[in-house]
């Protein structure tokens, strides 16, 4: 990229927005002019970019004039409110919310998985759900090699998935519980300190949550294959940052753990961390602030009578690859 771009970050003061700004700087994205947009209560404050203080502006319908790329992480309602303004201005909206992901004319993109879909955009490109990204960066290369037929996932999702307020609640409740103080859950349905909550997003009539069906529907859309059977259970865990997932995979063809390790070692965006004998395996503490997804505990599924099944454990930074980094990578491909 030789030219420079005017980039807007909408939702600049949120956890993902702040990470977007840092990622633009770390990856030397050719930003000629950076506009930081947020609500009226944040207007006038400043955030640093490349050593300079950038004043945050209130987001209005006129904020996108002259903008080339608008990175949105301000919630689905805000994305819907400003979509027409962004597209009319000639900018490309890269949206981190779930507002447009399943629309037929909106590409849903992970650059390591389906970069070719970017070309189909009509002004809006959707960032997938964080758990879907972390899963598919590891699963897609295996699917390309051996064709995935069935996937069962259990997630261990950090409090960062609920934003800064989620992480703060974990820290506060941990202190309160250690001191024997009463707690009052606010960011989550139940206490998150020293607890697990098998409830992310709202429940549907079939007993699944919206989060679980996002992983199903988004996977099928990005792999362009509605025949893949998928079931997920999403669980919030008392971890500050970085999600983990236990994946049981069934393929059309036989695959060994050795083959899987070789495929993943050669795949972009994946680091194989798989030496259990020496206590080496993916953990959220090691995935935090890392660009790559960590993949390990790769083993044959012994519940099967053939070699078409694998079990894999992955960890990835939800705020980075699960959100901000993926959005910036999409911008790099435009």
Positions of PLM-derived features:
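N-terminal Rossmann-like NAD(P) cofactor-binding subdomain of oxidoreductases
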Residues: 1-192, 227-229, 262, 279, ...
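C-terminal active-site/capping subdomain that shapes the small-molecule cofactor and substrate pocket
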Residues: 228-334
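Generic solvent-exposed, charged/amphipathic alpha-helical segments
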Residues: 21, 216-220, 261, 265
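Oxyanion-binding "anion nests"
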Residues: 193-240
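Glycine-rich beta-alpha junction loops
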Residues: 40-42, 130-131, 155-162, 196-204, ...
């Amino acid at each position: 990229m030789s030219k420079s771009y005017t980039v807007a970050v909408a939702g600049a003061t949120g956890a993902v927005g702040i990470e977007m700004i840092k990622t633009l700087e770390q990856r030397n994205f050719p930003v000629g002019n950076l506009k930081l947009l947020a609500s009226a209560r944040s207007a006038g404050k400043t955030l640093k970019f490349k050593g300079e203080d950038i004043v945050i502006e209130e987001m209005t319908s006129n904020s996108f004039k002259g903008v080339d790329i608008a990175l949105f992480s301000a919630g689905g309602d805000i994305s819907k409110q400003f979509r027409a303004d962004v597209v009319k201005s000639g900018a490309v909206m890269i949206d981190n919310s779930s507002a447009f992901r399943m629309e037929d004319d909106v590409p849903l993109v992970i650059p390591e998985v389906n970069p070719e879909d970017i070309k189909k955009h009509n002004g809006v490109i959707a960032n997938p759900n964080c758990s879907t990204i972390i899963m598919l960066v590891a699963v897609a290369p295996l699917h390309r090699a051996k064709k995935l037929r069935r996937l069962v996932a259990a997630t261990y999702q950090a409090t960062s998935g609920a934003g800064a307020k989620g992480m703060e609640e974990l820290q506060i409740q941990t202190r309160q519980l250690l001191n024997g103080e009463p707690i009052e859950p606010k960011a989550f349905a139940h206490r998150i300190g020293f607890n697990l909550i098998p409830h992310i997003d709202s429940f549907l009539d079939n007993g699944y949550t919206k989060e679980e069906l996002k992983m199903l529907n988004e996977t099928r859309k990005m792999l362009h294959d509605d025949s893949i059977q998928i079931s997920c259970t999403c669980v919030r865990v008392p971890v500050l940052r970085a999600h983990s997932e236990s994946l049981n995979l069934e393929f059309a063809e036989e695959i060994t753990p050795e083959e899987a390790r070789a495929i993943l070692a050669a795949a972009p965006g994946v680091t194989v961390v798989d030496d259990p004998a020496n206590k080496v395996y993916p953990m959220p503490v090691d995935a935090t602030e890392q660009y790559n997804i960590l993949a390990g505990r790769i083993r044959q599924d012994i519940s099967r009578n053939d070699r078409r099944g694998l079990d894999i454990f992955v960890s990835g930074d939800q705020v980075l690859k699960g959100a901000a980094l993926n959005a910036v990578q999409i911008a790099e491909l435009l």
